[in-house]
């Protein structure tokens, strides 16, 4: 794996922190590999090593890029619930995830905690200004809630 991908304590899941905007609370994190909560409790490692540090810096809007997320094996929703509760008015969005991952998110009842689906699939996200991308996602969520 290229050195730009950070080891986050998971055997098969790696991440890149692409963008953080502290004053507005945005973070963009790109994922690579296989997210496996069933065997390795990847969410616990990811939450404790990455997300908690960002929350401590008042980040409450997380855009997770899933273009390179190959698979997801869910287990319990405890850490997703905890993450969601800790960000109050923020959000967690998984963008550009594969159909089988969307189905697994649904099977694990994660729709209560995270946003995902076709409305968050943006092919040309890499060419967009990161702050504008986050603001665009925020607008979609705001309109969905109303």
Positions of PLM-derived features:
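Amphipathic, Lys/Arg-enriched alpha-helical "gate/interface" segment within cytosolic domains
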Residues: 1-22, 26-68, 72-146
